[in-house]
From Swiss-Prot:
The lineage of its organism: Eukaryota, Fungi, Dikarya, Ascomycota, Saccharomycotina. Belongs to the argininosuccinate synthase family. Type 1 subfamily. L-aspartate binds at residues 118, 122-123. Keywords: Amino-acid biosynthesis, Arginine biosynthesis, ATP-binding, Cytoplasm, Ligase, Nucleotide-binding. ATP binds at residues 9-17, 35, 114-122. Homotetramer. Optimum pH is 7.5-8.0 for the forward reaction and 6.0-6.5 for the reverse reaction. The gene is ARG1. It comes from Saccharomyces cerevisiae (strain ATCC 204508 / S288c). The keyword Zinc does not apply. GO terms for biological process: argininosuccinate metabolic process; L-arginine biosynthetic process; urea cycle. This is Argininosuccinate synthase. NCBIfam families: argG, PRK00509.1. L-citrulline binds at residues 86, 91, 122, 126, 179, 188, 273, 285.
Length: 420
């Protein structure tokens, strides 16, 4: 008799194929779920494999449009970044995948969900916190945290032996000495040889982005139009055909930015980051589209965003949003509160940025706006007396100097010399 139906996040790889068979051995019915978030994947082959192993159903949900509109573009608006360089490609995909998995679990009458995340990574937290927010009564079956599973499958050999026993087809390719996770925003590489932070990644590891040294000698120019902080149009000249190409749909804009950046060596990083579970981890990332869109967006904000709004956003909204996304706290009251602050900061971010991509570099060529009036070249010009007179600054400095003078007097009274 079945113990009930479980919705398993299935990748088609060795780990989740073994988990699928193991769940069947435990007496569960299993719905194999996959989310299409733009990764390179043979979904038909994954379906065939899951059903052959014994899944009662295979469901693949196309999340690409929702991923861009609901997650990736708001991340561009808020300039999301973790520890200065990581643009959160993996973290940003988790809420959309988790929601799709819970939706499938509900549709298929599953009492539980399951995944193949390890017990030392961030993803187990990101997925499960999302699951519990979206369906508070759901049960999570987490094999890699269950002694009866991880003690039985202590290494890859145990997984391969079990796969052979169950007739699970395993690709006869040499396992690469690192693990990967891919979506349309980026791909990550970690573990294996990368666990030594001083090991230089081999050239053949990088899958998506051309080596900057091998990138074209001819630069690629493009323009990106923003409305209320959202990229709404991307235009470029195809260097091979000399034809102008313009795209406006959110997914098309994102993919065009991705393809152009990848071809020109833009978006590779290699970092050591702090995981939510208080471990340091080395990761290599290819984050082409977010690198281009974020840099263009930051540049346009310099022209169109109020100074005080920008400082408040940068000091509070951006770091907290980025931290919450990294930690898997998307479906929480605090993240809902933070997300509500993004759009009000972006209402004036309207204009066009001209960008050049060249051998790994994103070069801003210029920016303009037809609607916003914060920038007036005559006000800051050295050649014109407009806005305010030079003598007006005397009073401004005098007011600003009041507390500075008191600070200097205090130091003098205490016999403390101000030093560099």
């Amino acid at each position: 008799m079945s113990k009930g139906k479980v919705c398993l996040a299935y990748s088609g790889g060795l780990d989740t194929s073994v988990i699928l068979a193991w769940l069947l051995d435990q007496g569960y019915e299993v719905v194999a779920f996959m989310a299409n978030v733009g990764q390179e994947e043979d979904f038909d082959a994954a379906k065939e494999k899951a059903l052959k192993i014994g899944a009662c159903k295979f469901v693949c949900v196309d999340c690409r449009e929702d991923f861009v509109k609901d997650i990736l573009f708001p991340a561009v608006q808020v300039n999301a970044v973790y520890e200065d360089v990581y643009l959160l490609g993996t973290s940003l995909a988790r809420p959309v995948i988790a929601k799709a998995q819970i939706d499938v679990a509900k549709q298929e009458g599953c009492f539980a969900v399951s995944h193949g995340c390890t017990g030392k990574g961030n993803d187990q937290i990101r997925f499960e916190l999302s699951f519990y927010a979206l369906k508070p009564d759901v049960k999570c079956i987490t094999p890699w945290r269950m002694p009866e599973f991880f003690e039985r499958f202590a290494g890859r050999k145990d997984l391969l032996d079990y796969a052979a026993q169950k007739g699970i087809p395993v690709a006869q390719t040499k396992a690469k000495p690192w693990s990967t996770d891919e979506n349309q925003a980026h791909i990550s590489y970690e573990a294996g040889i990368l666990e030594d932070p001083d090991t230089t990644p081999p050239k053949d590891m990088w899958k998506l982005i051309v080596d900057p040294m091998d990138a074209p000698d001819q630069p690629q120019d493009l323009t990106i139009d923003f409305e209320r902080g959202l990229p709404v149009k991307l235009t470029y000249t195809d260097n091979k055909t000399s034809k102008e190409v313009s795209v406006t749909k959110p997914l098309d804009v994102f993919l065009a930015a991705s393809n152009l950046a990848r071809a020109n060596g833009v978006g590779r990083i290699d970092i050591v980051e702090d995981r939510y579970i208080n471990l340091k981890s080395r990761g290599c990332y290819e984050q082409a589209p977010l690198t281009v869109l974020r840099k263009a967006h930051v540049d346009l904000e310099g022209l169109t965003l109020d100074k005080e709004v920008r400082q408040l956003r940068d000091s509070f909204v951006t770091p907290n949003y980025s931290r919450l996304i990294y930690n898997g706290s998307y479906f929480t009251p605090e993240c809902e509160y933070i997300r509500s602050m993004i759009q009000p900061s972006q209402n004036s971010v309207n204009g066009t940025v001209r960008v050049r991509l060249y051998k790994g570099n994103v070069i801003i060529l210029g920016r303009s706006t037809k609607t916003e009036k914060l920038y007036d070249p005559t006000e800051s010009s050295m050649d014109e007396l407009t806005g305010f007179l030079p003598t007006d600054t005397t009073g401004f400095i005098a007011i600003q100097a009041i507390r500075i003078k008191k600070y200097g007097e205090s130091k003098k009274t205490k016999g403390e010399e101000l030093t560099l």
